[in-house]
């Protein structure tokens, strides 16, 4: 694997190519895509990205569709909260 430095982190593999601002954008994306997330089914921090938009929990073996680089997208969170709010209004 390519050598990385303390300052640039995961994008050290690109060296001096592509420009600093583009590498900073890619760094943010790559950190979020390689991170482990909390599984919404079992609650463990085992949710890992398998492919673009495919997330797999190593503990409960559930596979779900999510965002390309993050487990939850902002639009999905908005829709989920709206559905929850509408269900609460319906129950009252």
From Swiss-Prot:
Cellular component GO terms, alphabetical: cytoplasm; cytosol; cytosolic large ribosomal subunit; cytosolic ribosome; extracellular exosome; focal adhesion; nucleus; synapse
GO biological process, any: translation
Gene Ontology molecular function: RNA binding; structural constituent of ribosome; zinc ion binding
Superkingdom classification of source: Eukaryota
Compartments where found: Cytoplasm
Protein residues bound to Zn(2+): 39, 42, 57, 60
InterPro entries from the UniProt entry: Ribosomal_eL37/eL43, Ribosomal_eL43, Ribosomal_zn-bd
Principal subcellular localization: cytoplasm
Ranges annotated as C4-type zinc finger: 39-60
Key words, A-Z: Cytoplasm, Metal-binding, Ribonucleoprotein, Ribosomal protein, Zinc, Zinc-finger
DNA-binding keyword on record: no
Known function: Component of the large ribosomal subunit. The ribosome is a large ribonucleoprotein complex responsible for the synthesis of proteins in the cell.
Quaternary structure note: Component of the large ribosomal subunit.
Entry similarity comment: Belongs to the eukaryotic ribosomal protein eL43 family.
Listed name of the protein: Large ribosomal subunit protein eL43
Organism of this sequence: Homo sapiens
